[in-house]
Structure formats: C-alpha cells, structure tokens
C-alpha cells in the first residue's frame, strides 16, 4: 500500500506486515522517549519522598548531617518576614537567618531579629543564656514539637570555668577557685548540701525534716533566754548530739558561723553568731528585726569550713572565691560532673504584653516577668 504523501509502505508477506526502515526508526525513537518519561516520573516520586521525610525531620530536631548538608548554602538563604525563627544551640549559627534548615544558635540573636507577633521555635538541647524580651507584644517562644528544651543556669566547674580541683586534705576535702560567683552546687545535676550542723541531706529529704534542726530551751513559761540569745537544748535521740557535745568532740568554734533560726513560728532568720558561752551552751546573735515568739525555737548552723564532715557537703569562701567540697566516697572532684548555679534568670520580659513561653524547662534558673499583661508561662518544669 502506498499513500499519497510517500511516507509509508506496507508489503504483505504471508499473513503479516513488515515496516520499512523509516517506520522502524520513528517507532524506536517513540519507545526511547517513553522510557525516559518513566525514568523521570520514578525520580520525581523518589525526590518527593525524600523531601517529605526531610521536612518531617526538620520539624523535630536537626541532625548534624542535615545541617552539614544545608550549611554551605545557608549564607544565601533568607527568612520571609512573619515566618517562625528557628534556634538550635547544637547545630545552628547566628550568621544564619533562622529558617528551619538554617537555624540560629542563640535565643538572643533570634530576639534581635524578631518583632511583635513573631514566633521563635527552639530545637532540642540545653541553652545557657540571659536574655530580655523588651517592647515586643504577642511574641511566642516555644519548644519545637516533641523536643526537650532546657535553659540551664549552671556552669561546669571544670569545662566552663576551667577550674582545677586541688588534692584532697586528710578529711577528704578538695578546693577550687571559681572565676564566677556561684550559690548552689550540683553533682550530675543533683543538688549538694551546704555544710551544716546538724547534718542533713537533700538525697534523703532530711533537710525538710524538723527533727534534723537543733532546738532551743525556751518555752512559753520558762523565759530561758531573751531575744539575741539562744541556748541549745542538747541531743536529739537517734538524730544528732547537742551543740556543746559536738564542740567538745570536734573543737568546732561556732563564732562566725551562720545560725538559721526559726524563732517566730512561720518566720525564719539567719544571723551570724557573735559569741559563745560554753558553760551553758548559749550563743549570741544580733536580734534586731528577727521574728520573735516565746515558743518552739529551732535552728541549724552553716557557713564555716569546719562544718564539712559528710560526703556531699560544701562551703564557699567569699573572701577568695574558693569552693570547698567533700566528694562522695573519696572520689577525685576533677573526674566528677560538678556544676554551680551562676544566674537567677534566663529570660526576662518587660514592657511587653501577650508574651507566651511554652514547653520550655528550666534548671537552676527561671523567668522574670515585669509589666507584662496577658503573658503566659505554660507546660514547663522548673528545678532549683
């Protein structure tokens, strides 16, 4: 068969047809294009799955390889105004814009770039910052979905403060000089107790047990002493010896120690001991301004190195910034995760309304709201 355009020939051979060379070549080209289309469709499906998985990871916590893969391009990536600002203390950089794939490293820098009504999302990790939200209404600061975000107000004595503990003395006490003021000590994030008498611990909650306070002899009827004085009532059976007995056994000089005294029911005061009468077991203190009632006096002593006599007790010498600590079981303090609290607040809010802090935990620090109407602080755990 021959058509008028002279493009196709069909020659009968038996019961079938055979295409000529021009027909074969065009059909081969068509099949080749079809194969390419199938390959392209398959690649698009695979890329879509990879993109979806990557996006889902990005909404939880960036892994090192995620950031490494995008980090080289982050200098050219910009964040659209009104979209969330992301922060990652581990993998982020303050040189980046704060997108989900190119997060900032600090909340401080995110706040610098934020305006009212913005949302700042923090990826998982521990943050040590001291920032202030000022004049930014309706700002949201929250943890990423499923992420544990902790603002930590402590610093490692060895890693952050470069402290080196000295050799233990005969009592197992080591010393280190701190380059920053600290007012709480933690071992592996467990609070250690300031050196005190009678001894008590946080670990067994005896610090909250009234039996682990010493008592005065004053009652409603005996007028045993007056304001500015306190006479120790002696041993507490099964708990502690009396102050006089302790002094006689150890040589402790109570003068200069801090007496934490409950002298007025629900009111407690701390005063330095200024004098000691060993004849009747009475010490003196400045009674000005103390809440005083003639009943149920209790107290304990702290604030002297000589009071360190139990594992986990510590004392800080303000005169030379030296921390003294008796390690558990004679361990070397240089090998322990010892941290000191160095800040009262991590996040402050002032001159701003409607600010929300959500899903963020705090250890050894907290938040401070001032002049903040309609602000909220939700789904958070605060320790120490």
Question: Where would I find each of the regions flagged by the language model?
Answer:
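Extracellular polysaccharide-degrading/modifying enzymes targeting complex plant/algal/animal polysaccharides
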Residues: 75, 79-384
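Boundary/junction segments of secreted and surface-exposed precursor proteins
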Residues: 55, 59-89
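Secretory targeting signatures
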Residues: 1-69
